[in-house]
From Swiss-Prot:
GO terms for cellular component: motile cilium. Heterotetramer of two alpha and two beta subunits. Residues 825-841 have a biased composition (Basic and acidic residues). It is found in: Cell projection, Cilium, Flagellum. This is Photoactivated adenylate cyclase subunit beta-like protein ST-. It comes from the Eukaryota. SMART domains: BLUF. Keywords: Cell projection, Cilium, Flagellum, Repeat. InterPro entries: A/G_cyclase, Acylphosphatase-like_dom_sf, Adenylyl/Guanylyl_Cyclase_3/4, BLUF_domain, Nucleotide_cyclase. CDD domains: CHD (cd07302).
Length: 859
């Protein structure tokens, strides 16, 4: 059974199937509505006893008060009294706790009643932003006959530590939740760690929705400051129509929305994309003169295929779809631009449509696209063309008039240092780190640890109160590596107290059920140095920073050199243990999915919604696995996931180690950026990645493992980007958008054609530092946006695509027991290039390593 709730919970209707609910919603033109699945089970077991205990479900949620000033203990008690009377009638149990400005509530009830009750609770105007922390089966009623036990945190404890810890974790968690992809959020709600889930095969309809000519909008001198407005409205329209039709937003790539639907909703997918185009047209017609919103048009490509939903990466993660169907969809969307159509879809999508819908479509021809040996058959709906040249001309003729945008973009360098968003980690390094990335390891790195290590290296591990003495607070959470007894906890205190007294640090540490939560206060250098020591303690792992910010005055009294908070503190209200544990566990998982800039801004005590849109110059990389399509054709889904996970982990490790920021993970493609004045860091990260791939091949080539065929290519470009927050309260993203975002992917794509593993553009060649001048560069026949490109010339940087493909085929033949290839040179996966080999498309040219001349030196 399905329940449809709208009009803020006042209108409710039940349906037997999801399609019935969706059809009613569409026919009634209901925009703001929620659907809930309800499982109806018998209340009497076969033996005649009650089955309530086995049908119970436990839901914990976090929300924010709309009027924190009135939420005193008396107000909360009245809320609980009314809830108690209502819940006793329907046999609901649980508790409600308030820690300004957050409500935390747990409800235990049978499946058929819980969704209905939560729908009404979500519509209550006294709170907003209801985020489910846990939603799973319960083994019984944990809170007995508490039909609604209430407590204001002030009534639970006067302990400052508990109030501070709960507030900081709840604030950080609620702020980061909106950046989480829906599928990963559902995992967390069920109490599962997305990173620990095995890959799941799915048949999906994938779409790429493009904002037409965004690069032209960005490049126009009168439109750069309006870029954030354009992106934000585009995201809003996409989210409204995709999620409203049963689809899922996979991710936002600058000016591109990647989405997917289950195959039973193919018709809804096409309808939603058409509605996005119509909504943008309506918005264009309503805009005042000089509004950049009048320049927004959308184009989309749709394709059906088998994909794999899984977690990719560990240091920076993405719960995403993998599979060749993703790449094909992107190519079809690009083809839509050439064919001047707003919506283009493949033959497989046409087969999923009903007879009525098929009569409306028309063929758009057979076309060859990149990455596929066979051509694709595409279709479109009849209608007016969408001429990209017309849109470009409209942009070029744009005059701003007197219209003022809501989120003006400002120059990053023009802002005072204190007002600049933390898009770079500008702390200088005292000692160069080794050029080989570290992979794996016991300790999980959080998003602040690199900055903290650099600060510590500059200041030294001095026990004196020298250096930066700014009063600072830092809160972290971690998990114990083994059970901790009272004796173990007591043994921590004397050493910690003595050490903290020497460094003027005070604070508290809470241990409950394997969870450590510690807050430190003191001079900044002393707090940072202590935190770095604590991270190395083998008694805990998964150390994650929750909050780090300057203080005006100490929260804890001077007598608290270190206070241990345990069960005694929570004895008056045991459910706090449950709340704290669930919040900390979810936060640890959530932090890896959120952009690093947002995490840094948030942990400094700021609201990410206040991040100012800025424009700046960056060096950007794009890298992916060479011949990935060929690899996927001979690999199982599990092997594809393993290859991507291994490669993405290597990329993020190398990039973060060199001071770069990972923007997006798109299938097997990783796109980071580096400071515009430090291209050598990007080159160093690329070197580390090449070394990793070579070592990986050498390790697995003799055991017929697909990892023995992994090679990669890197493109590097320089340009201006706008970094801005865009989206809604329920789904948001922090993007780096600009012409370079798309251009660097094109630079990387030509590596296959020219036979170089590393290709750069002219601006990047000018920015590379002297230590890389021993690498000559050679012009390529292709140019990107009028800019010539150059390949880095060394034999180890050659990319023999045909040799890689032969190696993949040879490995597949060996694994399947087929006869080896007849040509000896084809039987062995050779990833090196013999001196003198002619490159594809570079007739007559040879590498600098073989000729010793004819190259351009970097510098």
């Amino acid at each position: 059974m399905y329940i449809l709730v709208w009009k803020k919970g006042q209108q409710i209707k039940t349906f037997h199937t999801l399609d019935e609910a969706a059809q009613f919603k569409a026919a009634s033109n209901i925009d703001e509505a929620q659907m809930f699945s309800v499982t109806v089970a018998s209340a009497i077991s076969a033996s005649g006893g009650s089955t309530e205990a086995t049908n119970l479900r436990r839901l914990m949620y976090l929300s924010k008060s709309t009027n924190p000033e009135e939420c005193n203990p008396q107000f909360l008690a009245e809320m609980a009294r009314v809830a108690f009377i209502r819940n006793r009638e329907i046999r609901v149990s649980g508790f409600l706790m308030y820690s300004s400005p957050f409500f935390i509530q747990v409800i235990v009830e049978t499946d058929e009643d819980l969704d209905f009750l939560f729908a009404k609770i979500s519509a209550d105007p006294r709170h907003e932003m209801c985020i489910v922390l846990a939603n799973g089966p319960g083994t019984g009623r944990m809170y007995g006959d508490w039909h609604m036990k209430d407590s204001h945190l002030d009534s639970i404890t006067t302990h400052t530590a508990m109030k501070t810890i709960l507030y900081q974790i709840a604030r950080s968690f609620s702020s980061m939740w909106i950046y989480l992809q829906k599928s990963a959020a559902n995992m967390l709600m069920l109490g599962k760690d997305p990173a620990a889930q095995p890959p799941e095969r799915r048949s999906v309809v994938v779409t790429f929705i493009y904002l037409v000519e965004f690069c032209s909008i960005f490049s126009h001198p009168n439109l750069t400051e309006k870029t954030a407005d354009v992106l934000s409205t585009f995201v809003y329209v996409c989210v409204k129509n995709v999620e409203g039709s049963g689809g899922n937003i996979a991710k936002f790539i600058p000016a591109i929305c990647m989405t997917y639907w289950p195959i039973i909703r193919t018709k809804e997918a096409l309808t939603a994309i058409q509605q996005i185009s119509e909504d943008l047209a309506q918005l264009r017609s309503q805009q005042a003169q000089g509004s950049a919103v009048s320049l927004r048009y959308s184009q989309a490509g749709v394709h059906y295929g088998r994909g794999m939903q899984c977690n990719a990466g560990s240091r920076k993660s993405d719960f995403t779809l993998l599979g060749d169907c993703i790449n094909t969809t992107s190519r079809i969307a690009t083809l839509a631009k050439k064919l001047k159509t707003p919506l283009l879809f493949g033959f497989e999508v046409r087969c999923l449509l009903g007879d009525e819908k098929r009569e409306e479509i028309e063929g758009a021809g057979i076309h060859q696209v990149k990455g596929r040996d066979k051509p694709v058959v595409v279709y479109q709906f009849p209608g007016p063309d969408l001429d990209v040249a017309m849109v470009r001309q409209k942009i070029e003729q744009f005059t701003p008039g007197r219209f003022r945008c809501q989120m003006p973009v400002v120059e990053y360098e023009a802002l005072p240092i204190s007002q600049r968003p933390p898009i770079f980690d500008d702390t200088p390094k005292s000692n160069p780190r080794p050029r080989t990335p570290g992979y794996g390891g016991r300790q999980r790195s959080d998003s602040l640890v690199d900055r903290l290590i650099r600060i510590a290296n500059l200041s030294g591990f001095s026990e004196s109160a020298t250096g930066d003495t700014t009063l600072t607070t830092l809160t972290y959470i971690s998990q114990a590596t083994r059970p901790m007894s009272r004796l173990d906890l007591s043994a921590i205190m004397p050493t910690a107290t003595r050490r903290n007294a020497q460094q003027s640090n005070i604070g508290t540490v809470l241990h409950e059920n394997g969870l450590f939560v510690q807050t430190l206060e003191g001079p900044k250098d002393a707090v940072v140095n202590l935190y770095l020591r604590i991270r190395q303690d083998p008694r805990h792992t998964d150390v994650t920073t929750v909050h780090m910010a300057p203080l005006q005055e100490r929260v804890y009294t001077s007598e608290w050199t270190l206070t241990l908070a345990t069960e005694e503190m929570l004895a008056t209200f045991p459910p706090v243990q449950d709340v704290l544990s669930q919040l900390a566990k979810s936060y640890t998982s959530l932090e890896t999915y959120v952009p690093s800039t947002v995490v840094r801004y948030l942990t400094a005590g700021n609201n990410p919604r206040n991040l100012m849109p800025v424009s700046c110059g960056v060096v950007m990389l794009a890298t992916d696995i060479s011949s990935f399509t060929s690899l996927t054709e001979i690999s199982s889904f599990t092997e594809v996931w393993m290859i991507c996970n291994t490669f993405i982990d290597a990329c993020t490790s190398a990039i973060c180690q060199e001071g770069g920021e990972v923007i997006k993970l798109i299938g097997d493609c990783v796109t980071p950026y580096f400071p515009g004045n430090n291209a050598d860091l990007a080159v160093a990260a690329a070197q580390e990645l090449f070394i990793f791939c070579r070592q990986l091949r050498e390790a697995f080539v003799d055991v017929l493992d697909v990892r023995g065929c992994v090679s990669c290519a890197v493109g590097m470009d320089y340009g201006q980007v706008v970094m801005a927050q865009c989206g809604l309260l329920r789904l948001s993203d922090y993007v780096a958008a600009g012409a370079v975002s798309a251009g660097v992917v094109e630079v990387e794509a030509i590596t296959r054609e020219v036979g170089y593993q590393f290709v750069v553009t002219v601006p990047d060649a000018d920015r590379v530092q002297p230590q890389f001048r021993d690498y000559g560069i050679e012009p390529t026949p292709q140019a990107i946006g009028g800019l010539p490109c150059y390949g880095i010339v060394r034999e180890v940087f050659d990319l023999p695509v045909e040799s890689i493909k032969r190696g993949i085929k040879a490995m597949h033949a060996a694994r399947s027991g087929e006869q080896p290839l007849t040509e000896p040179e084809q039987a062995k996966p050779d990833f090196r290039v013999s001196p003198g080999r002619d490159r594809h498309g570079v007739s007559g040219r040879r590498s600098n390593s073989s000729q010793g001349k004819g190259s351009i030196q970097v510098g």
